[in-house]
């Protein structure tokens, strides 16, 4: 059974941003990523910022999700012969629909590996409706599924594997370039699972103070950068209480958990990065048509 009170409050807080090379200053890192993205223009435009209760909010709920930005920087740079993007889509997360959005723009297919369950999740159903190829695997933990997906991609010359959270330097470059077009705030709040977004924003805004609300798991070496972590006690799959949700569309298992921690109408310039909203599913019959249950493979090596 699932443990709904998973303790993820044993973060490694080392002040290190693993996306900044050990020999780089923050300024050099920023220059490095801006150079990486110099030929890329964000097709989704400068993020729309709306003030809510004295907080500047990046409203990426107006697009499929923030991951389309860095995702486009990566996918637009892939060689011609790559026609399939491979990714692991957990039950919760906008990466799948975001990759599909970008892949369509570049005429590429998407192969998603998903954890087996009795019934697919809303986010997985949206990916299937939007045309991904997919495989379900019974796994004990996400890293195992990452290995399966990477192996599948490695065996095919035309496939490109994207790690969980879209961890790739071109994705970071896209985040840095887009954020650099927004005036630097004093403080930044964002939801954090893998840390890709907060680390990219820290490079773009070297003087801002960062708070990461960790919603998914313990943060490992170099993942938090200089962000101060807040451990969200709710399990990743549990939704935030309605009364704590922000006054704009959000994912209630992700960004929805951050709003309650942000000081409202303070005298500080605080920015909150809202990565998206719930994707829309048009065909509800998908839930019953897709058989996502798999038994454990006998003697399968993990």
Task: Label the model's feature ranges.
Residues 3-20:
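Acidic, low-complexity, intrinsically disordered interaction modules
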Residues 34-83:
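Positively charged, low-complexity intrinsically disordered leader regions
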Residues 73-74, 97-140, 203, 220-226:
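Active-site-proximal loop->helix
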Residues 82-102, 106-114, 187-194:
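A short, small-residue-rich loop immediately preceding and capping a beta-strand
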Residues 93-97, 120, 195-199, 256-262, ...:
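Short, well-ordered alpha-helical microsegments
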Residues 116-184, 226-250:
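Small/polar-residue-rich loop-to-helix segments that shape phosphate-bearing ligand pockets
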Residues 175-181, 188-199:
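Internal active-site segments that recognize and position negatively charged phosphoryl groups
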Residues 207-266, 286-302:
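Active-site/ligand-binding loops adjacent to catalytic centers
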């Amino acid at each position: 059974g699932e443990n709904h009170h998973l303790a993820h409050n044993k973060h490694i807080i080392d002040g290190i941003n693993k996306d900044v090379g050990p020999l780089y200053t923050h300024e050099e890192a920023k220059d490095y990523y801006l150079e990486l993205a110099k030929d890329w223009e964000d097709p989704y435009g400068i993020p729309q910022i709306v003030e809510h209760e004295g907080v500047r909010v990046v409203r990426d709920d107006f697009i499929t999700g923030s991951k389309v930005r860095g995702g486009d920087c990566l996918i637009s740079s892939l060689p011609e012969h790559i026609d399939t993007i491979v990714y692991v889509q957990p039950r919760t997360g906008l990466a799948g629909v975001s990759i599909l959005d970008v892949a369509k723009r570049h005429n590429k297919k998407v192969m998603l590996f998903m954890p087996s369950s009795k019934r697919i999740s809303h986010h997985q159903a949206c990916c299937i409706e939007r045309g991904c190829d997919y495989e379900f695997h019974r796994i004990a933990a996400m890293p195992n599924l990452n290995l399966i997906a990477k192996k599948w991609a490695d065996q095919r010359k035309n496939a490109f594997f994207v790690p969980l959270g879209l961890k790739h330097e071109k994705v970071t470059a896209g985040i840095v370039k887009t954020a650099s077009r927004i005036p630097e705030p004093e403080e930044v709040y964002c939801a954090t699972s893998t840390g890709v977004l907060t680390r990219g924003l820290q490079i773009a805004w070297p003087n801002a103070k960062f708070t990461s609300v960790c919603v998914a798991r313990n943060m490992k070496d170099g993942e938090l950068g200089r962000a101060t972590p807040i451990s969200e006690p709710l399990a990743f799959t549990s939704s935030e209480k309605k009364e704590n949700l922000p006054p704009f569309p959000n994912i209630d298992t992700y960004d929805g958990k951050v709003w309650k921690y942000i000081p409202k109408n303070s005298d500080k310039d605080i920015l909150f990065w809202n990565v998206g909203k719930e994707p829309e599913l048009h065909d509800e019959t998908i839930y019953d048509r897709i058989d996502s249950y798999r038994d454990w493979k006998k003697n399968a090596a993990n």
